[in-house]
UniProtKB/Swiss-Prot annotation:
It catalyses: Preferential cleavage of bonds with hydrophobic residues in P1'. Also 3-Asn-|-Gln-4 and 8-Gly-|-Ser-9 bonds in insulin B chain. Keywords: Cleavage on pair of basic residues, Disulfide bond, Hydrolase, Metal-binding, Metalloprotease, Protease, Secreted, Signal, Virulence, Zinc, Zymogen. Coiled coil: none annotated. Residues 1-19 form the signal peptide. This is Neutral protease 2 homolog MEP7. Binds 1 zinc ion per subunit. One of its GO terms (cellular component) is extracellular region. Residues 20-181 form a propeptide. GO terms for molecular function: metal ion binding; metalloendopeptidase activity. It is found in: Secreted. InterPro entries: Fungal_M35_metalloproteases, MetalloPept_cat_dom_sf, Peptidase_M35. Its EC number is 3.4.24.39.
Length: 363
């Protein structure tokens, strides 16, 4: 989700794109529009209170936020300064034609509470002291609208928890172990298989081209990741090269890829999702409504959706990326630390001017 990180140096990565000159003045100044307060309810159960401090009503996007009912990452969990492994799902959402059900309306001054259990998506059975925090950017539409127009940057309070490991072990896990005997990467629908194979080939070409371009175009690295530090550029290129390799490894790669959702985690507005703990990527029905490659600057397509999802897979490159923000406006508001660990920063960086020289692979 738009989330958390407390670790000062999340060293890695990123995404390729070399143009789409949208004016920086296009970004609303919404640094203090949301107040997020975390409270402990009982052992591993947490309450988030979201307050609209803006001077107008908003429609907040629910996906990958506190409003998401799915097993998405709502807070970062740390023990002794080290992040705890997340065992839920990472989703890529549409940034266009979203249904009204994808939003939560909030009036000026209104507070909305949401409760969740952090033990449902992380193993906390060791017990003891933990710290949790959430930060990122929540996309929004204006009141009664569904067109994303900006993003509210937020950072919650840091909350310390004393967790009983035995009690944490009794919490039902949101994602059950997968049957390793099931060949989930077999796609029996020929049309979907053809689309997926094309997307993988296009992703391989696109990510490889973008990795090379990262070295040649520090101005664009600055635009998407807010740094031209050589170490960061190398990290960006390394992740993209890894994604290119994985996209081209249809038989012996580190991930499994399902062309249909057998786990009922798709819903309107979701393009695909990844289970990082299983290195499994799953396409949703709306994935197949996307073009193979878009000519629209910062648009979405099948190739960059594959690229986005592989950024979530630890088997491709570690540390795997989170979903701190979605869309160009949102990712432009992230700090360098969060941008380098944000999957959509990768897919947007990949969707740039150099695409004009990229031929769609059609066979």
């Amino acid at each position: 989700m738009l989330l958390c990180s407390m670790v000062a140096a999340l060293a890695a990565l990123a995404t390729p794109a070399f143009s789409c000159a949208l004016p920086h003045l296009d970004l609303p100044e919404d640094n203090s529009g949301l107040d997020i307060k975390l409270d402990s309810l009982s052992n591993t159960r947490v309450k988030a209170t979201i307050t609209n401090k803006a001077d107008r009503p908003l429609n907040l996007l629910k996906f990958n936020t506190f409003f998401d009912d799915g097993p998405t990452e709502k807070v970062g969990i740390f023990k002794d300064g080290n992040p705890i492994k997340f065992d839920g799902i990472m989703r890529r959402i549409q940034t266009f034609d979203l249904p009204i059900s994808a939003f939560v309306p909030i009036s000026p001054g209104e507070s909305i509470e949401r409760e969740f259990d952090i033990a449902s998506t992380s193993d906390l059975t060791v017990g003891g002291a933990f710290d949790i925090l959430s930060e990122g950017a929540i996309p929004y539409a204006e009141a009664n609208q569904t067109t994303l127009t900006g993003a509210m940057v937020f950072k919650s309070n840091a909350l310390q928890l004393k967790i009983d490991g035995e009690m944490a072990a009794t919490v039902a896990r949101a994602i059950q172990p997968l049957d390793r005997r099931s060949d989930v990467h077999v796609c029996r629908n020929s049309a979907k298989r053809k689309a997926l194979m094309k997307a993988l080939r296009n992703s391989a070409h696109l990510a490889g081209t973008a990795a090379s371009a990262a070295y040649r175009n520090p101005r664009k690295v600055q635009e998407y990741f807010h740094t031209t530090d050589r170490t960061a550029v190398r990290s960006v290129a390394a992740r993209l090269k890894a994604i290119s390799r994985e996209s081209g490894s249809t038989r012996n790669g580190a991930t499994r890829y399902a062309c249909e959702d057998h786990w009922n985690r798709c819903e309107p507005g979701v393009l695909a999702y990844t289970l990082p703990s299983h290195n499994l990527v799953v396409n949703c029905p709306s994935f197949y409504n996307l073009p193979a490659l878009t000519n629209r600057c910062h648009g979405q397509d099948q190739a960059t959706t594959v690229l986005h999802e592989f950024a979530h897979a630890p088997g491709v490159h570690e540390p795997f990326c989170k979903d701190h923000a979605y869309g160009y406006r949102s990712i432009r508001r992230l700090s360098t630390r969060l941008a380098l660990n944000n999957a959509d920063s990768f897919s947007l960086f990949a969707n740039g001017r150099f695409r004009r020289r990229f031929r769609v692979i059609s066979t």
